């Protein structure tokens, strides 16, 4: 059973999905797992505004996934709810972040995000994962009040757990060793901004180039205030790997 169908059964808002040609546009077309196919971020997501664009996008996407996901495009703010569930699917940790910028700016991975707290989002994300008897780490992606997808793995914005001083990683280690872990709501700092500086700089410049000056200038301002996602005191290996991959392998 699909995540989309289960969310509908639980009364959780989700975008409309289409099995064939959409009845209305715009729609988002994406493979079920773009990373599995080795796709770059810009190639994991496409928006069709009419039938001609849809046909062209489907022809391209079906090279990787014979039945890509076709969803109604939801506009508005994007957010993620990161959860840790124990062996009995009990809630052991939760952390919310909102997207501040992304790249490509038309729709792509987050380059800057900010921690916040939303009890309703956490409840809905947990209800969905618990219904599948899920255990472990996952990030549930929202757009406005709709759940878009579930990433049942360590996700790109995972460093926010450290930036916002969330105990999720510690709880994971304790639970894995059979220790007793108790969930406490809002057990992390809110209002913490975190960025991937190279990707975020490119995003800020792209906003400026697109005429979205306010967003672009805010991005340049965050260069001095937001926490760097991959900076670790005394260990530069992660940052060097990130720079190498960003500069030479994309």
What label would you give each PLM region?
Residues 28-30, 83, 144-154:
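A short beta-strand motif that forms the metal-chelation/ATP-contact edge
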Residues 26, 78-82, 137-139:
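Broad gene-expression machinery/nucleic-acid interaction feature
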Residues 49-108, 113-132, 143-147:
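Phosphate-binding site of ATP-dependent enzymes
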Residues 116-142, 152-206:
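Active-site "cap" helix and flanking loop/linker of ATP-utilizing ligase/carboxylase catalytic domains
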């Amino acid at each position: 059973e699909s995540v989309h169908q289960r969310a509908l059964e639980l009364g959780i808002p989700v975008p409309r999905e289409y099995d064939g040609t959409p009845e209305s546009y715009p729609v988002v077309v994406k493979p079920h797992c773009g990373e599995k196919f080795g796709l770059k971020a810009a190639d994991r997501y496409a928006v069709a505004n009419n039938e001609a664009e849809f046909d062209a996008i489907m022809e391209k996407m079906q090279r990787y996934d014979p039945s890509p996901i076709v969803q109604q495009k939801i506009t508005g703010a994007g957010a993620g709810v990161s959860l840790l569930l124990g062996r009995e699917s009990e809630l052991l940790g939760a952390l919310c972040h909102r997207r501040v910028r992304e790249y490509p700016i038309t729709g792509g991975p987050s380059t800057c995000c900010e921690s916040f707290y939303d009890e309703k989002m956490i409840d809905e994300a947990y209800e969905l994962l618990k219904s599948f008897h899920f255990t472990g780490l996952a990030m549930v992606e929202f757009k406005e009040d709709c759940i878009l997808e579930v990433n049942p793995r360590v996700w790109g914005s995972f460093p926010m757990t450290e930036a916002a001083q969330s105990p999720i990683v510690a709880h994971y280690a304790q639970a894995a060793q059979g220790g007793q872990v108790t969930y406490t709501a809002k057990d992390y700092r809110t209002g913490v901004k975190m960025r991937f500086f190279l990707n975020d700089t490119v995003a800020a410049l792209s906003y400026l180039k697109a005429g979205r000056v306010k967003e672009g200038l805010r991005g340049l301002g965050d260069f001095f205030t937001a926490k760097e996602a991959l900076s670790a005191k005394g260990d530069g290996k992660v940052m060097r790997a990130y720079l190498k991959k960003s500069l030479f392998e994309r």
